[in-house]
Regions:
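Surface-exposed, charge/polar-rich loops and edge strands
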Residues: 22-100, 104-109, 113-116, 124, ...
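Gram-negative bacterial Sec-dependent N-terminal signal peptides
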Residues: 1-19
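Active-site-adjacent beta-strand anchor residues
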Residues: 119
Length: 305
C-alpha cells in the first residue's frame, strides 16, 4: 500500500527527529534514516558543474533520478516507478533491494562528540537531492555510520582526529588551508564555493582516470589540487561545449603525464590514484554526443544564467 505524501512526510519527520534527539542506540556500521538538513558538511567546496549535470539529467530522465535515489539508499537501483512517483515518497516507487543491502554504494557519516552527524562522503549527491525538483532540506535519505567519535571530549579533538583520518577536506577552492569553523554548516549549493577543477576531474573520469578499487577520501580534490598550478582555466570558455571539451582534454593530458608519487599531498602515486595508461578517445568523443554529461550540464547551467 502506498502512503500519501502527507503521511510519509510526517513519518520521516518523526523518525529523523527521534534520531536527532537520541543516538544512544546507534553504532558504527548502522544504517540511519535522516533528513538532509541534519547532515553537517566536512568540505568547503563542490564542483557546481557536476551537480548541474545531475540536475539537468534528472529534469529529462526520471528513471536516472529514481535509480540514483535507490542507489544512495543502498538499494542497487530502481525497479519500478510511474508518473505518480515522487522522489521524497519512498512508497511511490520500488527499488531492486531493501534499504542498506548495497552498503558500498551508500553515503557515509560520522557521529561527533556533540551528537551531530557529519557527512564524510556524498556532498555532490546530497546537494543534488537538495536542489532537485521534489528534493529540499527535508528530503529523506539513509546513510551509513562510518565512525563514532563520541568518546572524544571536545570538538577540537574531533576535528583533529577527523583530519588525521582523512575524513575532512580543510582547504578552500584556492587550496588555502581553512579551519573547521569556516566550513558550511548545512548542505545547499549556496553554502559551498565552486571548485571548477573538481568538476573537470568528474568529466575527465573514464577518459584519463578512474577510481581505484579502494579510493582515498577526497580523491578528486587531491587531483584538482595537483592540476591547478599547471592548468589555468582562463583560456577556456566553460560555458560552451567546445571550451569544456578543450579543458577536459588539457586536464587529461596532464593527468596522463603525471609522474608524482604524492598527488596533491595525498602520499599516493598517480597510478594509485587511478591514472590510465592512455587517453580513451572513445569515452572522450562520447562527451560531445547528444544527451551526454556535458550537454545536460551546459543546458541546465545556461538556464540558470
Amino acid at each position: 500500500m502506498k502512503y500519501s505524501a502527507l503521511l510519509f512526510t510526517l513519518f520521516a519527520t518523526l523518525n529523523t527527529s527521534a534520531w536527532a534527539v537520541d543516538l544512544t542506540k546507534v553504532h558504527q556500521g548502522d544504517v540511519l534514516p535522516v533528513m538532509l538538513a541534519e547532515l553537517k558538511p566536512t568540505q568547503p567546496s563542490v564542483g557546481y558543474d557536476q551537480i548541474y549535470y545531475k540536475l539537468g539529467r534528472y529534469q529529462q530522465d526520471a528513471e536516472k533520478q529514481f535509480d540514483e535515489i535507490c542507489e544512495a539508499n543502498g538499494q542497487k537501483g530502481v525497479s519500478h516507478f510511474d508518473a505518480q512517483s515522487q522522489p521524497a515518497i519512498a512508497t511511490s516507487f520500488e527499488c531492486k533491494e531493501p534499504v542498506g543491502a548495497e552498503r558500498k554504494d551508500m553515503k557515509t557519516v560520522v557521529i561527533a562528540p556533540n551528537s551531530q552527524l557529519y557527512l564524510t562522503d556524498g556532498h555532490h549527491t546530497f546537494n543534488t537531492f537538495w536542489h532537485m525538483e521534489g528534493g529540499g532540506s527535508e528530503f529523506p535519505v539513509n546513510v551509513l555510520v562510518d565512525k563514532d567519535y563520541r568518546e572524544l571530549k571536545t570538538m577540537d579533538a574531533f576535528w583533529k582526529q577527523l583530519d588525521l583520518d582523512k575524513n575532512t577536506w580543510l582547504f578552500d577552492a584556492s587550496d588555502q588551508p581553512i579551519s573547521y569553523q569556516q566550513l558550511p554548516t548545512t548542505l545547499g549549493m549556496e553554502n559551498f564555493a565552486d571548485d571548477p577543477y573538481r568538476s573537470l576531474m568528474y568529466f575527465a573520469r573514464d577518459v584519463s582516470w578512474d577510481k581505484p578499487a579502494q579510493p582515498v577520501p577526497f580523491l578528486e580534490f587531491y587531483w584538482a589540487k595537483q592540476l591547478k598550478p599547471q592548468l589555468p582555466l582562463a583560456p577556456f570558455d566553460l560555458n560552451t561545449e567546445q571550451g569544456y571539451l578543450n579543458a577536459i582534454e588539457a586536464a587529461s593530458k596532464l593527468i596522463l603525464a603525471e609522474q608524482s608519487n604524492d598527488i596533491g599531498g595525498s602520499g599516493l602515486s598517480a597510478k594509485a590514484m587511478g591514472q590510465f595508461d592512455h587517453f580513451d578517445a572513445k569515452k572522450f568523443k562520447k562527451l560531445s554526443k547528444q544527451n551526454s554529461k556535458l550537454s545536460y550540464m551546459l543546458g541546465y547551467k545556461t538556464a540558470q544564467q
